[in-house]
Amino acid sequence: MLDLFRVFSNEAKTSKSVAKERLKLVLVHDRVDCSPQLLEMIKTDILKVIANYAEIEDDGLEIKMSKCRGEHDDKPVSALVANIPLKNIKDRCM
């Protein structure tokens, strides 16, 4: 999936912005008690399953853990957030 805003923006990834994103990722992993290795295993498994049914676009692919408020009791809960752009759905008859 082509992100037109990203293509036409003047925003270049600086080492500062990359370091900031990495630090955010480390902090989120610490808060949700999920190691980067575990998240990578989850990501790999999810992508394998989806690849059985659709062709995945690598650009824009993002899978991460985050904290959010619970729906019923407002307690913090861990959430797996995935943005997986698809090129097309495979035609499969079962």
Curated annotation (Swiss-Prot):
SUPFAM superfamilies: Cell division protein MinE topological specificity domain
Biological processes, Gene Ontology terms: cell division; regulation of division septum assembly
Keyword set includes Cell cycle: yes
Cell cycle among keywords: yes
Domain of life: Bacteria
Family matches, as InterPro entries: MinE, MinE_sf
Matches recorded under HAMAP family: MinE (MF_00262)
Functional summary from the UniProt entry: Prevents the cell division inhibition by proteins MinC and MinD at internal division sites while permitting inhibition at polar sites. This ensures cell division at the proper site by restricting the formation of a division septum at the midpoint of the long axis of the cell.
Protein name (Swiss-Prot/TrEMBL): Cell division topological specificity factor
